[in-house]
Amino acid sequence: MSQVTVGENEGIESALRRFKRSVAKAGIFSDLRRIRHHETPVEKYKRKLKQRSRNRRR
């Protein structure tokens, strides 16, 4: 779960931007899309390939 604390002098727009960035980095939307729709074997292979390359970079 992504969580962002808003500073005293920080605007809501910048906090929302930081939240969206953290959600994208965590991969929450891609997981949601995968759960809601049927995933073909080719899509599954491509997703796992991307995940492997992401893990190698870390």
Swiss-Prot record:
Gene3D superfamilies the UniProt entry points to: Ribosomal protein S8
Any one biological process term the GO annotation gives: translation
InterPro entries listed in its UniProt record: Ribosomal_bS21 (IPR001911), Ribosomal_bS21_CS (IPR018278), Ribosomal_bS21_sf (IPR038380)
UniProt-recorded Gene Ontology molecular function terms: structural constituent of ribosome
GO cellular component: ribonucleoprotein complex; ribosome
UniProt keyword annotations, A-Z: Ribonucleoprotein, Ribosomal protein
Coiled coil: none
HAMAP family with a match to the protein in the record: Ribosomal_bS21
Stated family: Belongs to the bacterial ribosomal protein bS21 family.
Name of the molecule in the record: Small ribosomal subunit protein bS21
